[in-house]
Amino acid sequence: AEVEDIYRPYKQKRRTRATIAREKGLAPLAKLLLSQTVTSGTLEALAAPYVNEEKGVMSTDDALAGAGDIIAETISDDAAIRAALRRLYRTRGVLWAKAATDEDSVYRLYYDYREPVSRVQGHRVLAVNRGEREGMLKAGVEIEDALALQEIRRAVFRGISISNAFVNACCEDAWRRLIE
């Protein structure tokens, strides 16, 4: 998994919103906002030089939206963040399962099942996996959004900047749209 995380930013991807934003020349704006080094002015003033109707960037809002997509993808591709979230899933995650159909089956014990990942027994994981494979269960591992966002913010934030609120929104977008 660690090797996959390291390789992930270089892996060939389908055309994402971030890819389109990079094609429009918004990567330098994203890098500037993510660096969190600008302490005066406004985001609109930073984005104004990137407005280019020929490339499809019609307004500062378009430029900021594209830069936000790039930042969110950068966050989601970061190997250290993915490793921290994986640790969080192992220590604070909850394995859940519920019935996928109305039929009664040998998996009825797992029709409304929740157990912390750190305490789950191996045979239960195998049973849930088997039930999911057979189409009798839906299952997954979840963690609290607040814990995941705290880990992401810990890795991303560098200090006080005019782009802090914007980068925070990008962290939430990365978590909800790309990682979770």
Task: Show the residue positions of the predicted features.
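Duplex nucleic acid-engaging cores and interfaces of nucleic-acid transaction enzymes
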Residues: 1-180
